[in-house]
Amino acid sequence: MNPARYRMIPADLFSDRSSLMKLYFWDPFRDFISQIVGESELYPSADPLQPVNVICYGPGDQSAWHYDSDNAFTMTLMLQSAEAGGVFELAPNTRCGIEEENLEYVSSVLSGERDRVHTVSRTPGELTIFRGCNSLHRVTQVAGARERLMAVFVYEKTPGVIGDPVVNQTVYGRVN
């Protein structure tokens, strides 16, 4: 299996005046996302690192097949496409919950079977919402001089949610 390699810029490194932070905290945007995902209300993450991130993939970088943490959905905004590679691949509904993994399906994806893997074209400005906790997904290896830059937005179903310190330590190298 290919190892993951990329850089993550956490929310606390962005100015409150940055376009990404303004979009994230803009009530009409959050209301729009709530309607799409079928939630009556969504709340900003209270974690200092997780609300808004930018994932940076340079030449040779990629993400391995993985699930996101146990959230209702994953939302990403493509900021800049790679010169080559950096393709988003998704194997939908490879599990129905953290405890209910379809091992045959997962094994087929990890062994290279492509019949149930979807390739999602990502152009700058494109917003993608998917069930990252239930769908195995990855980004293929990036090539060329131009980095692939993608924003990730984390909203919660209840107010005041702080992310898992183990996840923060693993992803950002620090807890807060």
Each PLM stretch: what is its role?
Residues T123, V139-M150:
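Ligand-binding loop in jelly-roll beta-barrel domains
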Residues D31-E39, P44-L49, I55-I129, C133, ...:
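Catalytic core of non-heme Fe(II) oxygenases with the double-stranded beta-helix
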Residues Y155-N176:
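Double-stranded beta-helix
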Residues M1-L49:
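Signature of the catalytic double-stranded beta-helix
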Residues T74-L77, I129, A145-G160:
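A short hydrophobic beta-strand segment most commonly corresponding to one strand
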Residues L136:
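Glycine-rich nucleotide phosphate-binding loop and flanking beta-alpha elements
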Residues P51-V52, N93, V106, A143, ...:
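Residue-level signal for alpha-helical context at structural boundaries
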